[in-house]
């Protein structure tokens, strides 16, 4: 429960909804930031806000807010939360509209910011060590897609890699880039 900021309004958590024909649902046209907040302070908050805007530019999802405006929105969400140690998710996406094909310039870019309590990503593994799988999936070449954007569509590689790891009893997968060099884990 609580509130999510959506398109300029605070919306009750359970009422924050998007249409089934939202472009992002069909084509992955969204960008986001996942941020940790400790004691009411978001770690490297402005850097995240700037990266969100940059990701939007790279993915042709022009975010209709400045980094400073996003900072105020995130601060408001953190202030009304019931706890001060949070995970903050800022998300921008192409909404529903007249374009349901791949191109979506006429669909409004929407934005939301939510915050919730979310423990350590690896749980107890941060104390015991994590068992890692080497994923069969590779991070794409930067000539394929703007892979430096934090874009939802790119995260399907992470989802597949994480599922692969869990099916083998591992905490996570380590992914290589298109050249065979270590790139990242899924989270």
Residues covered by each model-derived region:
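Short, acidic/charged, Gly/Pro-enriched secondary-structure junctions
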Residues: 70-99, 116
